[in-house]
Amino acid sequence: MLFFDTETTGLSGGTGTRAFMVGASDFVPGGLRVRQLLITHLSAEPAMLREFSRWLAEDTRLVSYNGRCYDAPLLAARYLLARQGTPLAGIEHLDLLFPTRRRYRGVWENCRLATIERNALGIVREDDLPGSEAPGAWLQYLRGGDAGLLRRVLQHNFQDVVTLAHLLLHLAAPDDARTGGA
C-alpha cells in the first residue's frame, strides 16, 4: 500500500493546476517510510513525475483522502501534459474519504482530515500550515522568498501521509477497539 497526497497550485484541478509536491508513505520492515518530492522550479515537474512512477509497482494499492476525485486525476493530467504515460491507470485505489464519511457523517461538524485526526485519532497538529495556504507558500518561494513557509508545507504533507496510514488502521479496527467517541 502506498499512502499518497499532493500539494498543488490550486484546487480547481484544471490543466493549469500543478502538483508541486507529492508525498507518500508505506509500511516497510521497521516502520512507516515517508518520501516526498518537491519541485523548486517549473521545469522539474517531468522529473518529479518520473520519480513518483518509480515508487509504483504492479501490485501497488494507492490509499488517499479524496484522491480518487482530486489527486489521482490531477496527476493523470500532469502525466499526459508531460507526455508520459500515467502509471496510475489500472492501479487499485482506496479513497479513505468515503468510508470515513459513512462512519462519521453527522457525528462531527465535517469530515475534513484535520477533524478526523483530532476526533478519531487524537492527533492535534501544532503550528500546521493549512493546505489552502500551500500554493501561496510555494509561489512565494519561487519568487525568491523565504523557504520557511515551504518547510511548513513539507511538514503538512508529511503529517497527511502519516495520518492516512493511521486512519486506515483505525477504520479497519473492530468497533470496540476504536477510540475517539464514535
Question: For the regions a protein language model found, what residue spans apply to each?
Answer:
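Surface-exposed cleft-lining segments at the edges of enzyme active sites
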Residues: 8, 35-39, 149
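Short beta-strand->loop
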Residues: 10, 64-65, 124
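Short conserved beta-strand segments at catalytic cores or DNA/RNA-binding microdomains
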Residues: 18-30
